[in-house]
């Protein structure tokens, strides 16, 4: 870093934290740091910030700058008088209330002056500062005063836990020093907070009584592993500029508890069991004072404390550093409490704050910490907290099966998902990790960036952020890396006609298309054969026969074109329909998007196919169809609200996961049909699909991979795990693992039912077991793409044969449960994302077979947790095969932005091959001439 960095100059010139400094000079310093090329780029040094009480200057940012370009000419005596008045005013302000204001600013925010003052002090004092900051960093607070208050709160809860937590922080910080980690990160406490949580929670979950001193040995060793895990995760997450949060703590604690367990002789842990019966809840017994007490208790549970006084003390510590962090902590705790009530959680669990602590952390992280605080990100923080609450319930129920607590896994996974969200909305601004400090300073940084970008824009600061500058320009450039599928199933029919010469059609047909036809039945002016090339001495009879033959052939060609053009309006992706609706009512456009979303489950971008699929769903079960349509509508609306790519929305790419969520939640509901309350969780879970899809796309864009139905799998798995069979409001179907050998008599097999399993397996993609529904789906696929229809049937057949090869019970085969994953895998590889050749056709069959066996494996594994496999086997197997690399030119993986449907994909591939060969021949000829 340069020696003339303004931050260093400030720290050198102001070694005493009690030296007053005007806020205006601090703001100028902040603005100079913003434009300085020597801004520290380390993603771990996240604390170059302003004091908290500089927030009131936020309102003067625009007004003070707008007048900066006005030149005022004044006389020398007037200038001297103005300077004297300013000096006297500043002096009076320094003698008055301003000194108190300045003194308070040294205790709030991240107390950077204190850190600078300690640089030349004994190492013991510096280390104490690091430990205190590490204790507060659990709640995203970089303030030693807050850390000291938090230690007081922990002592109120349990002194033994405090000792273990302190030891964990010290051991973790020392390990980071020994490993020569970034010194600024250590000084900010970023290598201490995970150790604090490890020490606390190991003491909390210990079955031994307090002051079991032998426990400090595993606390020391496990805490020392945190900097190693943190550094490793930072290396990976740096690709997406993401923080590691409390993942090192989660990994270390989970490994320790799984390694010891309840029956360990030296270090026994608390016994955790899954729910085995429906809870007995009487709503009249709910106690409002205890519910209100849950708010501070939920905040305290971040540190594993259930004492409301401890939670209150921690809230005070947060308020000292950042009132916005304190506010979002309380809001997050309330959201977790309300989410618990919506799924009939036992009151004791709610009163203990076990539903709230993950929401507290998520709400803080999204509400101003890693996103600049706007009303959009405030709402996003509420949604993230709600999503985190349900994910916490799902993980608690799932991990209880193996006797392990959920820790803060729910917070980490949900918040990372929301941080990976990409949006064209300028109000959703994710800060670079190196600029993250605390919400108030983050917002000032955001306003400064936006104002500077508005000044650089051609419009000169019209008050609306240009999408082509600054952060927003960076976001758009990153979206170009992620193939922006203007339509994943998109191809120009004119380009198909141009490329039709690849199949050997004559150039005369291309000339015919260039000439306008005033009437569709007009005889083409260009004949099939060029008569000028014939000899003048040809007999009249031969000329007449030739002319008649050419007229018949040209008429057949024209008729074939008319039929082909008519079919093109209802086959393929029906691009003409989408373009024709652009100037129509938004209602018709939205209906088109929803119908395309219904068919995109099967990789079909065709509204007519979508209508047939909806018809097939009503044939199966009208209630399921209603739930599925609602899921599609809500998922599409959410994508619009989040300003996702409009062309992807129009292609139905933000709707198909929603339809599967709605359908499968109705299928697995134990309440039966027309349980209207089920539509509430259908709406909530469907709305998470665009968020999950955007986050996964950000990750998968590194390898140019689609997200497939992973958002649906995540959403439905979380919902089913969070509710379960014993939930009072939303009970689900009971799934249990096999405990006995199935009784199979091969002579009892029925060939007719096996054949019927082919359409049933296709219908099971939507959760339907009606063969007529599966047949309607096949017709819908055939209308859009015969190749998709063919590979769907092949995939279902392969799944059935694979099930027979491992002696699967016949009922499972007849119901198509072994065929739907193979169906999707065969379509994806057989011409959809690979160009269709005989090699990729065989590859599709192999992928379908692999998906069938993987489906059986996951079904057996997930049944232990009471969960269905959904389409996890398809996603994992298809992604595995798409990551395949080969030197065989016939195995050609299409760029994601060029994927349409198999027939058009092959035309694109052949045209590329033709261009490549032509360029190769040209290069060879040029080389030969030279």
Curated annotation (Swiss-Prot):
The keyword Glycoprotein applies. The chain crosses the membrane at residues 145-165, 185-205, 213-233, 242-262, 280-300, 311-331, 350-372, 401-421, 610-630, 648-668, 676-696, 705-725, 774-794, 813-833, 842-862, 864-884. Residues 1-90, 452-479 are annotated as: Disordered. It is a multi-pass membrane protein. It is found in: Apical cell membrane; Basolateral cell membrane. The modification Phosphoserine is found at residue 487. Residues 12-25, 32-43 have a biased composition (Low complexity). Signal peptide: none annotated. It comes from the Eukaryota. GO terms for cellular component: apical plasma membrane; basolateral plasma membrane; membrane. Its main location: membrane. Residues 1-11, 56-89 have a biased composition (Basic and acidic residues). GO terms for molecular function: cell adhesion molecule binding; urea transmembrane transporter activity. Keywords: Cell membrane, Glycoprotein, Membrane, Phosphoprotein, Transmembrane, Transmembrane helix. InterPro entries: Ammonium/urea_transptr, Urea_transporter. Belongs to the urea transporter family. This is Urea transporter 2. It comes from Mus musculus. The gene is Slc14a2.
């Amino acid at each position: 870093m340069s020696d003339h960095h303004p931050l260093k100059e400030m720290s050198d010139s102001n070694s005493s934290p009690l030296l007053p400094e005007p806020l205006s000079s601090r703001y100028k310093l902040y603005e100079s740091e913003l434009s300085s090329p020597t801004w520290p780029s380390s993603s771990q040094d996240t604390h170059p910030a302003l004091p908290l009480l500089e927030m009131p200057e936020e309102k003067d940012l625009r007004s003070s700058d707008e007048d900066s370009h006005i030149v005022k000419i004044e006389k020398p005596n007037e200038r001297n008088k103005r300077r004297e008045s300013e000096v006297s005013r500043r002096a009076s302000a320094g003698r008055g209330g301003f000194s108190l204001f300045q003194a308070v600013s040294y205790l709030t925010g991240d107390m950077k002056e204190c850190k600078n003052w300690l640089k030349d002090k004994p190492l013991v004092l510096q280390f104490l500062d690091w430990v205190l900051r590490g204790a507060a960093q659990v709640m995203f607070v970089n303030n030693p005063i807050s850390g000291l208050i938090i230690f007081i709160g922990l002592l109120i809860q349990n002194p033994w836990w405090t000792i273990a937590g302190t030891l964990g922080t010290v051991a973790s910080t020392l390990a980071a020093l020994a490993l020569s980690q970034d010194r600024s990160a250590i000084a900010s406490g970023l290598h201490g907070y995970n150790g604090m949580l490890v020490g606390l929670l190991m003491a909390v979950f210990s079955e031994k009584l307090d002051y079991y001193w032998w426990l400090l040995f595993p606390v020391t060793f496990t805490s020392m592993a945190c900097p190693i895990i943190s550094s490793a995760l930072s290396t990976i997450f740096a690709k997406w500029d993401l923080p590691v949060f409390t993942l090192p703590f989660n990994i270390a604690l989970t490994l320790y508890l799984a390694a010891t367990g309840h029956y360990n002789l030296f270090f026994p842990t608390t016994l955790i069991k899954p729910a085995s019966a429906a809870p007995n809840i009487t709503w009249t017994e709910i106690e409002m004072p205890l519910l209100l007490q849950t708010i501070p208790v939920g905040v305290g549970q971040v540190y594993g404390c259930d004492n409301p006084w401890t939670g209150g003390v921690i809230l005070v510590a947060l308020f000292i550093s950042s009132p916005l962090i304190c506010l979002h902590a309380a809001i997050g705790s309330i959201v977790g409490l309300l989410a618990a009530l919506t799924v009939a959680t036992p009151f004791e669990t709610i009163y203990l704050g076990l539903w709230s602590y993950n929401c507290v952390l998520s709400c803080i992280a999204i509400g101003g910490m890693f996103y600049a605080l706007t009303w959009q990100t405030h709402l996003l923080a509420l949604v993230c907290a709600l999503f985190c609450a349900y994910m916490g319930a799902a993980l608690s129920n799932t991990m209880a099966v193996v006797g392990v607590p959920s820790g803060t896994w729910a917070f980490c996974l949900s918040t990372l998902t929301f941080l990976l969200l990409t949006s064209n909305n300028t109000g959703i601004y994710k800060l670079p990790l190196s600029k993250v400090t605390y919400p108030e300073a983050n917002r000032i940084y955001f306003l400064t960036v936006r104002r500077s970008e508005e000044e650089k824009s051609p419009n000169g600061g019209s008050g609306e952020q240009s999408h082509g500058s600054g952060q927003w320009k960076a976001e758009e450039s990153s979206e170009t890396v992620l193939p922006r599928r203007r339509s994943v199933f998109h191809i120009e029919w004119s380009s198909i006609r141009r490329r039709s010469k690849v199949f050997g059609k004559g150039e005369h047909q291309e000339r015919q298309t260039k000439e306008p036809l005033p009437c569709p039945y007009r005889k083409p002016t260009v004949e099939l054969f060029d008569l000028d090339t014939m000899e003048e001495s040809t007999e009249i009879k031969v000329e007449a026969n030739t002319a008649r033959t050419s007229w018949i052939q040209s008429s057949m060609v024209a008729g074939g074109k008319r039929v082909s053009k008519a079919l093109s309006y209802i086959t393929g992706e029906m691009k003409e329909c989408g373009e024709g609706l652009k100037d129509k009512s938004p209602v018709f456009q939205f209906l088109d998007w929803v119908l395309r979303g219904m068919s995109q489950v099967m990789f079909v971008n065709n509204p007519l196919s979508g209508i047939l699929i909806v018809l097939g769903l009503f044939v199966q079960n009208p209630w399921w169809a209603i739930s599925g349509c609602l899921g599609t509508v809500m998922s599409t609306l959410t994508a619009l609200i989040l300003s996702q790519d409009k062309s992807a929305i129009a292609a139905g790419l933000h709707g198909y996961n929603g339809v599967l969520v709605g359908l499968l939640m109705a299928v697995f509901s134990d309440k039966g049909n027309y349980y209207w309350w089920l539509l509430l969780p259908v709406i909530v879970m469907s709305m998470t699909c665009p968020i999950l899809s955007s986050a996964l796309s950000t990750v998968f864009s590194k390898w140019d991979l689609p997200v497939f139905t992973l958002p649906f799998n995540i959403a439905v798995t979380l919902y089913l795990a969070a509710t379960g069979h014993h939930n009072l409001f939303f009970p689900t179907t009971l799934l249990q693992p096999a405990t006995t050998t199935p009784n199979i008599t091969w002579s009892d097999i029925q060939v007719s039912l096996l054949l019927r399993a082919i359409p049933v397996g296709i219908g099971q993609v939507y959760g339907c077991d009606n063969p007529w529904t599966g047949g309607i789906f096949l017709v819908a696929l055939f209308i859009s793409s015969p190749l998709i229809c063919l590979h769907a049937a092949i995939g279902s057949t392969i799944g059935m044969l694979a099930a027979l090869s491992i002696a699967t019970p016949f009922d499972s085969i007849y119901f198509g449960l072994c065929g739907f994953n193979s169906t999707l895998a065969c379509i994806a590889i057989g011409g959809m994302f690979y160009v269709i050749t005989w090699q990729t056709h065989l590859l599709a069959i192999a992928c379908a077979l692999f998906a069938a066996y993987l489906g059986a494996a996951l079904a057996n594994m997930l049944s232990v947790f009471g969960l269905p496999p959904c389409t996890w086997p398809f996603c994992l197997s298809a992604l595995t095969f798409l990551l395949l690399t080969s030197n065989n030119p016939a195995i050609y993986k299409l760029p994601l932005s060029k994927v349409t449907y198999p027939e058009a994909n092959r035309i694109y591939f052949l045209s590329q091959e033709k261009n490549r060969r032509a360029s190769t021949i040209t290069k060879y000829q040029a080389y030969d001439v030279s």
